[in-house]
Design a protein with these regions (language model features):
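A charged N-terminal "starter" segment
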Residues: 1-117, 122-136, 177-179, 183, ...
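Conserved, mostly hydrophobic/aromatic
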Residues: 32, 56, 78, 110, ...
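Flexible loop/turn segments at secondary-structure boundaries
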Residues: 59-62, 103, 126, 147-148, ...
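Short acidic, glycine/serine/threonine-rich loops at helix termini
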Residues: 64, 86-87, 107-111, 128-131, ...
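Structured core elements
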Residues: 73-75, 96, 118, 139-141, ...
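Glycine-rich, aromatic-flanked loop segments that form ligand/cofactor-binding clefts
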Residues: 133-147
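Active-site loop/helix belt of alpha/beta enzymes
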Residues: 144-290
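Charged (often Lys/Glu-rich) extended helix/loop segments that serve as interaction or gating elements
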Residues: 260, 265-420
Length: 420
């Protein structure tokens, strides 16, 4: 079980809302830093370990700087993510660039920054050489095909995913890259998403460590690092058990000692890209109740919508909800909690048991620190909300203002009206 406790009180929420109107995404600096330190401690046995935070999860430079201060790098997948990371001071081996169907501009920018470039396809070897150049160190993304099983259950279906290369293609890519001047190599793979088990990373590590030994033997390539990518999830639901990062790190260490060390590859660095695990629990969407509707069901309408948090509408994903100030009240009312989009799937919760809710109540939607604001959009003319940092000293800082109508119309060149 995972107890879902907001990291702010109703009084704090009202204090922030007096300065920055709801809805807004709020991030907990203290929680972010403490979690980053736990991750680094869990993998401290590996001298080359580095967490590359997935920028796509939460692309905000203020948050990237916090993670940078805690020793993290960044995982980028687009030109603009590279630009944001560069602006934050990330360079060279602090950047992992993993992309697919990659434009030449993106590849060249990653090369110019000295990033570790992770190639998604065999044809990208020639593409890299043509449009950027072949660096000393290159990574290739592996897809084992088939299904990825853990215990008695299938975790995911890599064979149906568009990402990565087969083992034969990996070997061919390494051979071609060595001929073009590459000297060191990385292996990267992502086989399952949001796993809530301590066994996923160790199982994946075993697969990739054995692959590394085979590729080293078959091609002579020096394997510099193995990137376990993301996939370590969080307990969105209270009835789920949270992952134990210390146990996960220890499980990976055992596989490392069992497979790589006997093969003379004990100097291989371990990388991770845990966007969700690093930030999701340390972010929340704070929103105010605007309306109640009593028809065939009971509806609670809030000032946020799916444009602020897409996951429930897009995936049917569960996000826990707390009514601030009513944490100890009985959850004896059944509601659909809805936003104002002209779409019936704009619902943060369906048939959710909550305390009795009144207009003006402040609703705290948990675990939006990753894939929350970043997946926002402007459908229905909705404007993206502000982002706020709750600092370690209890003060708050606006780290992204809310969009305005001027922002929404900024790309039009049609009428002076839009410049108002």
């Amino acid at each position: 079980m995972t107890k879902k406790v907001p990291f702010i009180t109703l009084a704090q929420a009202k204090e922030i809302a007096a300065d920055i109107p709801t809805p807004f995404h709020l991030y907990d600096e203290k929680g972010i830093r403490e979690n980053a330190r736990r991750v680094n401690a869990a993998f401290s046995w590996n001298k080359g370990f580095k967490e590359y935070f997935a920028v796509k999860a939460t692309p905000n430079p203020y948050l990237l700087k916090i993670l940078q201060e805690e020793g993290c790098g960044v995982d980028c997948s687009s030109y603009t993510e590279l630009l944001m990371s560069e602006a934050c001071g990330f360079r060279g081996s602090d950047i992992m660039f993993s992309s697919n169907d990659t434009p030449a501009q993106d590849m060249k920018k990653a090369y110019d920054l000295g990033a570790y470039i992770n190639l998604d396809d065999l044809t990208h070897v020639e593409f890299l050489e043509k449009f950027a150049g072949v660096p000393k160190t290159v990574c290739c993304r592996y897809n084992p095909g088939g299904v990825f099983e853990l215990g008695n259950g299938i975790m995911d279906n890599p064979g149906d995913a568009k990402y990565g290369m087969s083992e034969d293609q990996m070997a061919e890519a390494y051979t071609k890259l060595m001929a073009a001047g590459a000297e060191e190599f990385g292996i990267h793979s992502f086989l399952a998403s949001n796993t809530v088990t301590d066994d996923y990373y160790p199982k994946l590590a075993g697969v990739l460590f054995e692959l590394a030994v085979r590729l080293h033997k078959s091609t002579g390539a020096k394997i510099k690092f193995i990137n376990l990518s993301g996939g370590v999830g969080i307990a969105y639901r209270p009835d789920q058990r949270s992952n134990d990062i210390a146990a996960i790190g220890e499980g990976v260490r055992k596989k490392f000692e069992e497979i790589l060390v006997p093969a003379g590859m004990g100097d291989v660095a371990i990388f991770t890209e845990m966007g969700r695990f690093m930030l999701a629990p340390y972010g929340a969407l704070v929103t105010t109740v605007l309306h109640q509707k009593h028809i065939y069901k009971e509806y609670i309408g809030v000032d946020a919508c799916a444009a602020n948090l897409m996951r429930p509408a897009m995936y049917g994903a569960y996000h826990h909800i707390t009514v601030l100030g009513k944490e100890d009240a009985p959850c004896d009312h059944k509601y659909d909690v809805t936003g104002g989009l002209c779409e019936n799937n704009d619902k943060f919760a369906i048939d959710r048991m909550l305390p009795e809710i009144e207009i003006g109540d402040v609703v705290y939607i948990h675990d939006t620190g990753a894939h929350g604001f970043s997946m926002g959009y402007n459908y229905n003319g909705k404007l993206r909300s502000a982002e706020v940092l709750l600092k370690e000293d209890g003060s708050h800082q606006l780290i992204r203002r809310a969009e305005t109508p001027a922002d929404y119309f900024a790309t039009f060149d049609f009428s002076p009206f839009f410049k108002k």
